[in-house]
Amino acid sequence: MLRRALLCLAVAGLVCADAPEEEDHVLVLRKSNFAEALAAHKYLLVEFYAPWCGHCKALAPEYAKAAGKLKAEGSEIRLAKVDATEESDLAQQYGVRGYPTIKFFRNGDTASPKEYTAGREADDIVNWLKKRTGPAATILPDGAAAESLVESSEVAVVGFFKDVESDSAKQFLQAAEAIDDIPFGITSNSDVFSKYQLDKDGVVLFKKFDEGRNNFEGEVTKENLLDFIKHNQLPLVIEFTEQTAPKIFGGEIKTHILLFLPKSVSDYDGKLSNFKTAAESFKGKILFIFIDSDHTDNQRILEFFGLKKEECPAVRLITLEEEMTKYKPESEELTAERITEFCHRFLEGKIKPHLMSQELPDDWDKQPVKVLVGKNFEDVAFDEKKNVFVEFYAPWCGHCKQLAPIWDKLGETYKDHENIVIAKMDSTANEVEAVKVHSFPTLKFFPASADRTVIDYNGERTLDGFKKFLESGGQDGAGDDDDLEDLEEAEEPDMEEDDDQKAVKDEL
């Protein structure tokens, strides 16, 4: 009997030794306990992270806050994390290509976990999970339930229907199913109608900013409701941060106007107020974004727009379609009237795109590798008598730094050639209409001709590879844009950024 008891204790000890630990309500998983955690929890959200990853560090407090909130509610949903640098087998098994990668497991299904795609704040995480595990809209039987829902999140949508089986109520539920990151509630209770000053069916979007609530007006259809929510779910002016980036770039509004404003400036409140006043006329059309130009994390964005800290406050507009296009106001005045006028003129198609260019250095053609800027690009690259091979680079790009000595040797090789020119252009400070650069370094060949031909180089990045390409007239090593490997620099180590944040970096 004693032997049996000791055996049971020993087995229990082994099981406990493999049981997941908890850090701030978040389960710590390893390969040895991953399957056990999936079996123990019906719903499990797992973050694959790296200890050195800046985005993971920024997410950590919000992730823990979400985990604690769900645990306190007695939810079946648990949050977990895996150090993918230590558990490389798990990372490979679940296709982790960047950090953080967050996957949602339901009923222990390892074949097709759902990728988490919502925002990086605790409310976003909780709302997304509840929508994935519960009804599209929570039934609100009384005023207390309604108040709890409304107070639970920055944004909540409530449908007030005296008949919850009506066609309008069904359209409302379809809209609720289409949105993952906002909680929806539905009620037929007369006391709830009275509590929120409704005397007939309606839909209200409640929010903890700006005007506090928006009442839907019009025919209740799924499409109309989604449009109404799109117009009203974000603040009139939203600050660009690590947490808000997914909301900004994941939304349907692809025209963004950005106010670069240091929080330390003396008239900060006044300039932000002017920007907000202008925003009122463009809800659902243009997203108004404020960027703290003093913040270190935002310096790359300033660089992308060709701005320096000392040039701020400043306003720029960008369209995030397939090809991004930037626009600059004609006036540097930051009054509400000027900003409003600029936006109207943009929407009317009266503003020309803004292309950045550095000043042309006096010695731009004195070295074997010629220096191109926006102002001399056309004359050099499309010279009908010259074959011009150009590297489009970024100063911070590690791949570009590795290529630099090879590119210099290539310049030396052809410095006395009668019709071959080796050149480079800093694409973070110069833009040209003829070439869209999506990754760094990008290498393009402009053969001597009158038809403005552009050939992409997709061969080996070696001196011999480049020489073969040039001696073959741009054939040996040529490739289409679709074949180009995306070699945009990631912060070392290579896997720091997840897909959402990499998209932000690609765009900004």
From Swiss-Prot:
Classification via SUPFAM superfamilies: Thioredoxin-like
Modified residues annotated as N6-succinyllysine in this record: 222, 271
Recorded GO MF terms: protein disulfide isomerase activity; protein heterodimerization activity
InterPro entries: PDI_thioredoxin-like_dom, Prot_disulphide_isomerase, Thioredoxin-like_sf, Thioredoxin_CS, Thioredoxin_domain
Subcellular location: Endoplasmic reticulum; Endoplasmic reticulum lumen; Melanosome; Cell membrane
EC number(s) per entry: 5.3.4.1
Range of residues in the leader sequence: 1-17
Region listing for Disordered, in residue ranges: 471-508
Job description of the protein: This multifunctional protein catalyzes the formation, breakage and rearrangement of disulfide bonds. At the cell surface, seems to act as a reductase that cleaves disulfide bonds of proteins attached to the cell. May therefore cause structural modifications of exofacial proteins. Inside the cell, seems to form/rearrange disulfide bonds of nascent proteins. At high concentrations and following phosphorylation by FAM20C, functions as a chaperone that inhibits aggregation of misfolded proteins. At low concentrations, facilitates aggregation (anti-chaperone activity).
Protein name (record): Protein disulfide-isomerase
Taxonomic lineage from the root: Eukaryota, Metazoa, Chordata, Craniata, Vertebrata
